[in-house]
Structures are given as structure tokens and as C-alpha cells.
């Protein structure tokens, strides 16, 4: 009997789609020209890079000249935050506002700036992981250079009130950046209508290859060059263009934003069924807001067990999942995201993240809700923490 395989970790990465792979292949063997070369092979490559730029721009409601290709979402975040910090420092503005539960690409960049003379204010989230725009308003100062708030959280899927936060920034005359790596393709985005000044995205979250990303920078914002060298990316990011990856990103984002409502209508009922069934397990809680969350995100904590053990057991049963973000899954520290919404360390350690797409069928859903309770029960039967809980003893 063939072993069942269910991939439920799309927030960590996604498979390259057949459509994207087919679009990329010619650029490895036949259309391999350097996009900076003036002969036809190079001109064709440059044309296709610009076509991909147009696709990314259209998907975001931006203009092509506002799109720059990068290697990943983390690079885009670094450029937006460090670039703005350098730009605004010349005007005496050395204060950044962000939240306590951003991706580490944002948090660690802010920590870097703190070590180099900048001040950072970390606004809180409520127990559902939502930011109050009024907290952002209170945090903004005369010397604030940038507000950077993620669009949707990578662990608990909470979707932030981006338009309201952007409106606060616009009112205060402060630039606003959002890490939308998890949001693109799952929610409708229009950077101009929403008042977003800068936005980061990553290809491998939307079925493009790893190692390609992009950043939207509103026209009129002139960030310092990210990489010095040749004139690629209008002189802002030197280095020979990764044409196959760029073309793939264009195809991927075009597909990702196609029929988002229809895709969500398929995924959300499956997500809700999993949540409803798993919450029947005693001493279990849903992390994040029930409604204001990404369509395929499920994050649940099971008291009395370790997330790592849960993942290993699920893997043996053919289910790929996560206990937090893949970037930190090797760490024994509890998720900073879960701690920020008020979970105790022991409860945060027992978290499970499932991130599903349309390819997780109704049959797969039934297997998931049949398997996980059995695994949780088995782990609890071996857990000294669970035993202490049942005796009413403190365990955290």
C-alpha cells in the first residue's frame, strides 16, 4: 500500500507549479542571453524581464517602474527598512515603528539598526494577534522614519488592518512598508488604493522557485542603492538578472492573484472543518483570529506535548506540517509570535501550524482530523507535563 503524503506546510514553501516550470525551462538552454547584452538573445531576455515586471506590477496595482526584483522577501525587507533608515537619517529621523510579532527578517533588521543608533518602538498585538491602528498612531513621533507592519502573519495567519495603518502613516507623513510575503495570492492587494509605500514579496510562497523575490517602492521614494556595480534594476541592485527566476515569478504571481475569492471559497471550509474537529480535543486552543486570518492557515496549541514530537509523529503518518515558522523550526525557543499573544511557554511549545491549499482534498482533510487526535493522545500518554497537568500541578 502506497504511503499517504499530505503537504500542509505551504506557509514554509510551495512546489514550483508546472506552469511556472514550463515557462522557466527555455531560459536555461535556448533563451539564456544576458539581459544586459545588446544582441537579440540579450534583448529578448530583457524584454521578458520587463514583461515579468509588468505582471508583478499588475498583481499589486502598481506601475512597472515601481517594481524591483530581489533574491527573496528577506532581502526586500532589509532594503526597505535599512534603505529608509539611511535615507531619513539625513533629515534627523532615526526612529522606526514595528510590531512585536514580525518575521525575523524585519525584527533582526530593526535590532541591527538599534545597535547603530536608531530607536525602535514595538507596538503590541492583542490575544488574536491583531494590531490596533491607534497604537501605531501613538507610537509615531516627529522623528519617525518608517512604520513597518506585516500584512499577514506567517505563523498564525492574522491579517492586519493594513489600510487603516497606512492611513495613519499618511496622516502623520511617515513612510509605510509591509511584508506581504504570506499575503500575496491569498488576499486582494492594491498598493495605490491601500496607501502602501513599500511592499515585500517572495516567489517560493506562490509556486515560483526559491531565490527570487520583489519589492514595490512607490514612485518618488528614492532609496539608496542596495548593491553597487552594474546598472541592473535601474542602477539600484547590481548583478546579472536571474532571467528564468524572474520569468517564473511573473507567471506565478499572475496565477496566484487569479480568482483569489474562488480559491478561498474552496480552502476556507476545509480549514474550518479541521479547526472545528481539532478543537474538540481537550486542552486545545486556536491561535489567531477565527475570521481575520489567511484562508489556509491553521495554528493550534495542544497543552501537555512538545511540538517537535508532534511533527515527527505526523511525518511518520505522511503529514508535513510545522510547529512555527520554518526559519526557526530548528530552535528550541518557543515562538515569539505565540508568546506575543499571551501564551505560556509550555503551551507555545505544543503548537501546530497547518497551511493548506486547494490540493489538500476533502479526503485529505478527513485523514488529518482522524490522525492528529490519535497522535496527540499518544504523546500525552507519554508526557510527564501532561501527567502533572492532570494532577493539578504547575507545569510552566
Curated annotation (Swiss-Prot):
Keywords: 2Fe-2S, Cytoplasm, Iron, Iron-sulfur, Metal-binding, Pyridoxal phosphate, Transferase. GO terms for cellular component: L-cysteine desulfurase complex. [2Fe-2S] cluster binds at residue 327. It is found in: Cytoplasm. Optimum pH is 8.3-8.6. The keyword Nucleotide-binding does not apply. Its cofactor is pyridoxal 5'-phosphate. PROSITE patterns: AA_TRANSFER_CLASS_5. Homodimer. Forms a heterotetramer with IscU, interacts with other sulfur acceptors. PANTHER family: CYSTEINE DESULFURASE, CYSTEINE DESULFURYLASE FAMILY MEMBER. This is Cysteine desulfurase IscS. It comes from Ruminococcus flavefaciens. The lineage of its organism: Bacteria, Bacillati, Bacillota, Clostridia, Eubacteriales.
Amino acid at each position: 500500500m502506497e504511503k499517504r503524503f499530505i503537504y500542509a506546510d505551504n506557509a514554509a514553501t510551495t512546489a514550483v507549479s508546472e506552469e511556472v516550470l514550463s515557462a522557466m525551462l527555455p531560459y536555461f538552454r535556448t533563451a539564456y542571453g544576458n539581459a544586459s547584452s545588446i544582441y537579440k538573445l540579450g534583448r529578448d531576455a530583457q524584454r521578458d524581464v520587463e514583461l515579468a515586471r509588468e505582471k508583478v506590477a499588475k498583481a499589486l496595482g502598481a506601475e512597472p517602474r515601481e517594481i524591483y526584483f530581489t533574491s527573496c522577501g528577506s532581502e526586500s525587507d532589509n532594503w526597505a527598512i535599512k534603505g529608509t533608515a539611511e535615507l531619513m537619517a539625513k533629515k534627523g529621523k532615526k526612529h522606526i515603528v514595528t510590531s512585536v510579532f514580525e518575521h525575523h527578517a524585519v525584527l533582526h533588521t530593526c535590532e541591527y539598526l538599534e545597535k547603530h543608533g536608531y530607536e525602535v518602538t514595538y507596538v503590541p498585538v492583542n490575544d488574536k494577534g491583531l494590531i490596533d491602528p491607534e497604537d501605531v498612531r501613538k507610537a509615531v513621533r516627529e522623528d519617525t522614519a518608517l512604520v513597518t507592519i506585516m500584512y499577514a502573519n506567517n505563523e498564525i495567519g492574522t491579517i492586519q488592518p493594513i489600510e487603516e495603518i497606512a492611513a495613519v502613516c499618511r496622516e502623520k507623513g511617515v513612510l509605510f512598508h509591509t511584508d506581504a510575503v504570506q499575503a500575496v495570492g491569498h488576499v486582494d492587494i492594491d498598493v495605490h488604493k491601500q496607501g502602501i509605500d513599500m511592499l515585500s514579496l517572495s516567489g517560493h510562497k506562490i509556486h515560483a522557485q526559491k531565490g527570487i523575490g520583489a519589492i514595490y517602492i512607490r514612485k518618488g521614494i528614492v532609496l539608496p542603492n542596495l548593491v553597487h556595480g552594474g546598472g541592473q534594476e535601474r542602477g539600484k541592485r547590481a548583478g546579472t538578472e536571474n532571467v528564468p527566476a524572474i520569468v517564473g515569478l511573473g507567471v506565478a504571481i499572475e496565477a496566484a492573484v487569479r480568482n483569489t475569492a474562488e480559491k478561498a471559497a474552496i480552502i476556507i471550509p476545509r480549514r474550518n472543518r479541521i479547526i472545528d474537529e481539532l478543537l474538540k480535543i481537550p486542552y486545545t486552543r486556536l491561535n489567531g483570529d477565527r475570521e481575520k486570518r489567511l484562508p489556509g492557515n491553521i495554528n493550534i496549541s495542544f497543552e501537555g506535548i512538545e511540538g517537535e514530537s508532534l511533527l515527527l509523529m505526523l511525518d511518520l503518518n505522511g503529514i508535513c506540517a510545522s510547529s512555527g515558522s520554518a526559519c526557526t523550526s530548528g530552535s528550541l525557543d518557543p515562538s515569539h509570535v505565540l508568546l506575543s499573544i499571551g501564551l505560556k511557554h509550555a503551551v507555545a511549545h505544543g503548537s501546530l501550524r497547518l497551511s493548506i491549499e486547494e490540493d489538500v482534498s476533502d479526503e485529505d482533510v478527513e485523514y488529518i482530523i482522524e490522525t492528529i487526535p490519535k497522535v496527540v493522545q499518544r504523546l500525552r500518554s507519554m508526557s510527564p507535563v501532561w501527567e502533572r497537568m492532570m494532577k493539578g500541578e504547575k507545569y510552566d
